[in-house]
Amino acid sequence: MGKYTRRQFITSAGVGMAAVAGLGLAGCAPQTPADKAMANTGNGGTTFADTIAWDGEYDVVVIGFGGAGAVSACYAADAGAKVLLIDKAPQGMGGGNTRFCGQIILNSDDKEAMLAYNKAMAGDFAVDDELMDAYAEGLTQTKTMLRDFFGVPEENFLDWKEDSSAQPMIAMFVPEYPELEGGDALHVLTVSDNVCNSALWKTYRNKVMSMSDNIDVWYMSPATKLFQDPVSRAVIGVEIDKAGETVNIRAKNGVVMTIGGFENNKQMVEDFLGLTKSTPAGTLFNTGDGVKMAMGVGADLWHMEAYEGNCFALGGISFVVNEDQHAKTFNDLRNLSGSVIVVGNGGERNLREDVYNRHGHV
């Protein structure tokens, strides 16, 4: 059975997060013997966990089957854990934003350069040094992880710094901010010969399926509540709406929340981002449920005003679509003849169509 420290687990999961454009990961620490002793109610040694009618038990429960959820579940299972991986989407419609993103992986062999670049990207924002170090360490191991653990053949990798002929605009990401320290040591990779084809997501999904002896997957099963010991504050389980039936699952060694954002929750978008008109470019299932559950057990919020428009698409401009549809964006007007302009509802032109946009800072 494999052995992983807490930092190694977070770093490995962090690789997955970075590879899928910053998907969120938060882990709840397992109970220690001291925690369990503190949680005794004094009623004959009964613990808080004993007061709940459990319908099942796993070593680890992972909420959200996107890239970060898949990576977390696979590493936990590799360490010998019995894992439950749940997702609110139906089978065939899951994958979170990992499925819809460009499948582009930031990578470097130089950890110090990666660290310097990420710190420069953070600008004046205060970011925990240990978190920054974990990201930099993980991003230097991305290719090795995908090759050795997830089974991507060496010949499948494409380094777009060396060859961007399939999609010339990808060259702008190598690096995206060349003026920042460390940028010259960065590369971007894909696990296939193109982008926006869900290839990275399929790699993660296939690994999860191959570990079905240790990983159970429940679709159409959103988490609705976290069970938190009132004394130790440890999260010990999850309430799940499994296809309309409420089930309580105990997590003996922790709950991992890879729950995506809130881009499909109009009230949260208005409250946190100040937007009254927006259209999701990725999954239609990110409605902020996990954010609310995390707040319910005392989690602080950070960077809730930060969001990304499609950097390929003139800063995220979309045609008007129905609420149950993905954004329909302009991908790259520079590939056209030069005879196209973009105007708003009032007929005004307010941007340059002949230049690329860039992502905002971290």
Q: Which residues does each PLM region occupy?
A:
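N-terminal export signals
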Residues: G2, Q8-P30
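Beta1/beta-strand and adjacent pyrophosphate-binding region of the FAD-binding site
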Residues: W54-G66
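Core beta-strand elements of the Rossmann-like FAD/NAD(P) dinucleotide-binding domain
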Residues: G56-Y58, G244-G254
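Glycine-rich FAD pyrophosphate-binding loop
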Residues: A79-T98
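Glycine-rich active-site loop/strand segments that organize a redox cofactor
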Residues: G102-A136
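An anion/pyrophosphate-binding glycine-rich loop and adjacent beta-alpha core
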Residues: V291, D300-V362
